[in-house]
Amino acid sequence: MGPAYQRTTVRADLSALPADLAAALRDHAESRQLTITDDLPAWITRSINPPSSSLTGKLFGRRANPADPDSEHQTLVALHPTHLLVVVSGANRGISALSVPLAVATVETPESADGFAVTGFAGQDGRPGSYHLGVGEPHGAECLEAVRAAIMAAKNP
């Protein structure tokens, strides 16, 4: 069984985002009194959920990750000076945004081959939540290192 997703991560120009992603990012940031400028470091990952390679999957027209409602989705990661912002968009899943203060965030180790998890988001029962950020070439490793460095800098001013 191959990877569940085919991913491509590139640097994102916040002034050139699709309208729905830009609106979700700005609305979420505004609701948290964060100022978004077009020069913030950001990356966008396109995740394609390919058709299943198994015989049963092919027979029933399933995808590699049958739990994902979309054949593809986009994930935007933006580094604000004090927060990590994430916006996810897909045809069936819709669009959602979340953020975590860098000072309470942690990059979980070990990272997976196709991404990394960040802990510190609002979770359930008073415990911190975790979110997996899938990344790919050519700039996935750069995204991970920038997120890790921003978290470390926020914790060690």
Question: For each predicted feature, which ranges?
Answer:
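Phosphoinositide-binding peripheral membrane targeting modules
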Residues: 54-115, 127-128
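Low-complexity intrinsically disordered segments
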Residues: 2-34, 94-157
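Anionic N-terminal interaction surfaces
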Residues: 1-76
